[in-house]
Amino acid sequence: TAGVVYWEKERGMGMPVIIPEKFKKKINKDSECLANVLRLIQNTESLFVERPEFFPDYTIHGITHIEKVLNYASNLIAEQTMKKLTAKDVSLLIAAVILHDFGMFLTKAGVRKILLGDGRTHRTEHLDKCSWEEEWDAYLKQIKRYSEEKLMYYFGIGTMIISPDLTSNNLSDIDKLIIGEFLRRHHHRLAHEIAIGVLPGGMDQDIFAGTSFTKADKEEIGILARSHGMP
């Protein structure tokens, strides 16, 4: 059925992932847009059935969460506005919803890229005040001043924070929580950078493989994904 993809790993019985009817009707008018959406969902399937590396206690809400956000977006768009949107507009919005939490799934390679590698000085003009290196330094200084109560709330410990050794392959659970909280705070920015390819090694896969999304499309997807965490 057009607009339906099966995610048997998570749901176990081949239950479909449903694109809201308003969106499905629109993208069904353009075979390329429909193909792009379905291929993106297939490319990212594994992310919705695995716990992120830096969130050991993360609750897997997978495609259910994506469906809820898609439905919220669909309900927020008035019918008159919907009539003005093209199939491509809707396909980019769907892609942004799929990508919006991807910053939470950054791997060690991705973290090292933004904090130790060539991504550490990156910032997007007009959107970022600080580079990743500056954001990380500011974050560490902040959490090292936390009260015992705050340390317990965020990290489950009441002792002073020690900066994680990002070069280590044996990060402790506390190290992962510290890194994970940093990713959580900036996951909207990360989603944007993943979409535009600033972090090509951070996801261990090409999420746009087999699609015809252009560079401009990916920028728009990234900005839309980023917007859910912008003031």
Segments (PLM) and residue ranges:
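Alpha-helical phosphate/pyrophosphate-handling elements in metalloenzyme active cores
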Residues: 55-92, 105
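Boundary/junction segments of secreted and surface-exposed precursor proteins
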Residues: 17-23
